[in-house]
């Protein structure tokens, strides 16, 4: 396992923001475990067993065994780890009762959404239904990993709270991801009547190691460009503001919600310290590269032609006030998050 990932797993396992007493000796099912973000639930929980002997049983549900071997091969012979290879949309049958379920199984990105909209929708909605049924039957708590995309198009405002809601074109292909996340959130509320205990998290853009360079995430696209050459090409003028959070802060925040939040609660997973414009992100990453100058190019021809769309998506910065009410605080600065990513991808810092 990479050094950066090992260090991040240790940070998660050592966090005081998680109520580890509730996880001690329990079974945690992680759906979509192969994904960039959910893999860190696996790493963090198993590292906790190593340093504190908490006896947490981790079941990693994923479709691709080869990818799972690459991510978790070192755990395959451990008694506290079980690989469950299957589609989350199929009925889930396991021989061990889960105490906690984390639903993080969902393709993400504009390209995959446009090419495979039904797969994206079903992973969120059908997958969530299957896991909610399991939660209700076993008296387990489910954490649904939603997205800040559910807020849709909001009038220009500085911060987004959990109570805000914007418009969303639910029949547009580009909106399938957000629409399916909204639908799954509604399912979580519906299943409360059947005894399901569900909590929802809405992460902002999560930065960290272990993301494939072909990923569509904004910061990964920039790093990929720098690895191929000496420039970053931005679509537009770089003025839209976004909220970024490092993986260790995101995972500890979500585990805090899993172990401390009230039933049915919804939390943004973000930090105001990670707010930056697209231009500021590009300048920060470019400035961390030593021994060569990275040029930032603004391609105005690719800017969205609709002024209304440009306006409503210019700021996507959720508030963390509610999450901080659980005792959580961000520990990784925006600069440090960028540095660790650059180190992971072999760019000099």
Role assignments for model-derived ranges:
Residues 85-123:
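NAD(P)H-binding glycine-rich loop region in Rossmannoid oxidoreductase-like domains
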Residues 1-100:
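N-terminal Rossmann/SDR dinucleotide-binding element
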Residues 171-199, 227:
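Active-site Tyr-X1-5-Lys
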Residues 150-152, 175-176, 199-217:
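Flexible, glycine-rich beta-alpha linker
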């Amino acid at each position: 396992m990479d050094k950066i990932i090992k260090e991040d797993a240790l940070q998660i396992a050592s966090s005081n923001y998680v109520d580890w007493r509730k996880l001690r000796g329990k079974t945690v099912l992680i759906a979509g475990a192969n994904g960039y973000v959910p893999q860190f639930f696996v790493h963090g929980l198993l590292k906790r067993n190593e340093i504190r002997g908490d006896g947490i049983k981790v079941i990693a549900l994923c479709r691709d065994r080869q990818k799972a071997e690459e991510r978790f091969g070192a755990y395959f012979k451990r008694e506290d780890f079980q690989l469950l290879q299957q589609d989350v949309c199929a009925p889930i049958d396991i021989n061990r009762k889960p105490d906690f379920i984390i639903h993080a199984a969902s393709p993400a990105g504009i390209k995959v959404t446009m090419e495979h909209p039904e797969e994206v929708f079903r992973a969120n909605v059908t997958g969530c239904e299957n896991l909610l049924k399991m939660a209700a039957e076993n008296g387990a708590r489910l954490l649904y990993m939603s997205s800040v995309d559910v807020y849709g198009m909001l009038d220009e405002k500085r911060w987004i709270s959990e109570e805000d809601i914007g418009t969303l074109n639910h029949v547009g292909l580009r909106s399938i991801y957000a629409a399916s996340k909204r639908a799954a959130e509604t399912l979580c509320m519906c299943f409360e009547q059947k005894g399901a205990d569900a909590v929802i998290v809405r992460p902002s853009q999560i930065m960290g190691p272990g993301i494939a360079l072909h990923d569509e995430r904004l910061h990964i696209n920039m790093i990929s460009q720098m690895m191929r050459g000496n420039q970053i090409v931005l679509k537009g003028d770089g003025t839209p503001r976004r909220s970024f959070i490092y993986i260790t802060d995101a995972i500890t925040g979500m585990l805090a919600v899993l172990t401390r939040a009230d039933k049915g609660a919804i939390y943004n997973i973000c930090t105001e310290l990670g707010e930056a414009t697209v231009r500021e992100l590009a300048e920060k990453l470019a400035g961390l590269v030593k021994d060569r100058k990275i040029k930032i190019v603004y391609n105005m021809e690719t800017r969205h032609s609709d002024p209304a769309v440009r306006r409503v998506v210019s700021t996507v910065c959720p508030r963390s006030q509610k999450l901080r009410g659980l005792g959580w605080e961000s520990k990784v600065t925006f600069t440090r998050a960028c540095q660790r990513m650059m180190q992971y991808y072999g760019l000099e810092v």
